[in-house]
């Protein structure tokens, strides 16, 4: 393991502390100044203490030391990002990998998965740096070679390559100015077609089936694969659990792919409870099949515990609580990419860029999971008279989000709104 950097968050500013300063304790300019301004001698110690308290701001300090294996320490060498930010990205990728795939037998595949997650993290908050349509070289990685390092020899190699490229395509558009274009407009509108379409699109956005496939690959379980129906069930359970816990995080981010943004609040608790029960039932049913433990481990950790164990989430900052409503400060920090979060603010314009969109549809067998092109074509302009959609005009007053009502009204997963 390698210690990378220590950061302290003071009033939303990162202060790097050198090893020599660590032994001396934290001393920012403001605290030094306060100690100089306070009287050295005072006949009334109570008065002096009161004065000191009055001049000392209530600052919540939080210090992180990043750890990750040396295999990824020299990645992103040619990428223009601050060293401390790279350290946080590497640590986030390592922590996520350890949480969702806690067991592994193939270290090389495990490292490839970390690199996949590194690319994904950057796509989520620096979308302009990632364009899967332009080149196979992303952030200094050979994308196809990295995917091959993870999946070569598995039954899902080609399928998972398309899955991940779809994730990069949509996620990077969402986190960049490209979200003003025709592709993302249609993507957001298409979310409303049906619950089944919603969960398939959310599955890709969360890399849910991709991580299940990765867990199998990292444990050399190349003889196991799931049917489409099985993937849908597993990912719907995992995404429902995750989105229920991440509800306020998603709200702080203005996240379009948040299941419970589109249904009555009381359904969030009920859905989480039922999916958790199903997860434990499935776990018990598969208990004597150790090969399937890797799949259950992913769904279990993804469904909640990562919010406590990963430093990407605010469990420590919010006094060891989960499910705390976002504040203006949290939203502001999200805009500044604190904890690698990203705010998708509503846009007041939409760019009619149909040429790029048509070119991407033509490459859908390379850049989109099976069925997504049809989702975009069928539902890109909206199919429900009760929903509000982004219009395809140069200037409009609609937000970047589509307001859905399917989850509250649909009685079964295949029903359209």
Curated annotation (Swiss-Prot):
Keyword check for Lyase = yes
- Supply the induction statement: Expression is enhanced at 60 and 90 minutes after the addition of the ABA precursor mevalonic acid (MVA) to the medium, but declined after 120 min.
One GO BP annotation is: abscisic acid biosynthetic process
Q: State the EC number(s).
A: 4.2.3.-
Mutant lacking the gene: phenotype: Impairs the production of abscisic acid (ABA).
Question: What domain of life?
Answer: Eukaryota
Give this protein's Gene Ontology molecular function annotations: lyase activity
Homology family = Belongs to the alpha-ionylideneethane synthase family.
Query: What does this protein's UniProt record list under function?
Result: Alpha-ionylideneethane synthase; part of the gene cluster that mediates the biosynthesis of abscisic acid (ABA), a phytohormone that acts antagonistically toward salicylic acid (SA), jasmonic acid (JA) and ethylene (ETH) signaling, to impede plant defense responses. The first step of the pathway catalyzes the reaction from farnesyl diphosphate to alpha-ionylideneethane performed by the alpha-ionylideneethane synthase aba3 via a three-step reaction mechanism involving 2 neutral intermediates, beta-farnesene and allofarnesene.
The protein's name in its UniProt record: Alpha-ionylideneethane synthase aba3
Organism this protein belongs to: Botryotinia fuckeliana
